[in-house]
Amino acid sequence: MPRRPLICVYMMSNRKHGTLYIGVTSDLINRAVQHRDGEIAGFTATYGLKRLVWYEQHETIVGAIQREKSRKKYKREWKLNLIERDNPNWDDLLEQLH
């Protein structure tokens, strides 16, 4: 049976407490692989953000987009606290999703 794509808000980083990117996707695994492999030009490729360090699943893409917009307004400290709470070692969560 094929896997069901995960609709998520997610954060990528290059290292613990490094540069952060917040995005939204309707297929988290595919998108994280694209970031890791450098297939997406732009901010994540420029800064080498290849590690999926946080994600939050949503039922709809509309809900995920709304959450992404609010998360992007968060201060950096709040974003770091989200990651530290759910992923204190800043592991690459893509490995757990495969």
Regions found by a protein language model. Give the residues of each.
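A short, polar/charged loop-to-alpha-helix boundary motif
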Residues: 77-83
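Catalytic/regulatory signature loops of cyclic-dinucleotide turnover enzymes
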Residues: 72
